[in-house]
Amino acid sequence: MTECTVHQAAEAFIGHLRESGKKERTLYTYRKDLDVVEAFFGADRQLAEIRLPQVGKFYKSDLLLKLPDGKERAERTVTKTVRVFRMMMVWARESGRIEELPLPKSTPMGHSRVKESSDEQPNG
């Protein structure tokens, strides 16, 4: 496992997406989403130290749910930030930066379901 901070992981994840051909506008909006993640968890915190209860607190936090002026963020914006956070964490696990994925099963995945969906048992 490669040790890294939340900030280092966010930067490396954005770099990975850039190399994968994501558009600069997408990278810009994802970086803004990850700024919210860094503000909550702390940029210098070790990514591997993040646990499920802390993620739950993040999902309920004013940093995620409200704008700086106190107004509520649009549900679509909150969902996207959560999705980008999950994408980064899944990438971090797949790239050896963390061993366990500290995310609830109900976290939205967005358009690209990652390998986890193949790990689930089919019903029936």
Enumerate the language-model features and the residues they cover:
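N-terminal helical hairpins
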Residues: 1-3, 19
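N-terminal core-binding DNA-recognition domain of tyrosine recombinases/integrases
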Residues: 11-25, 31-118
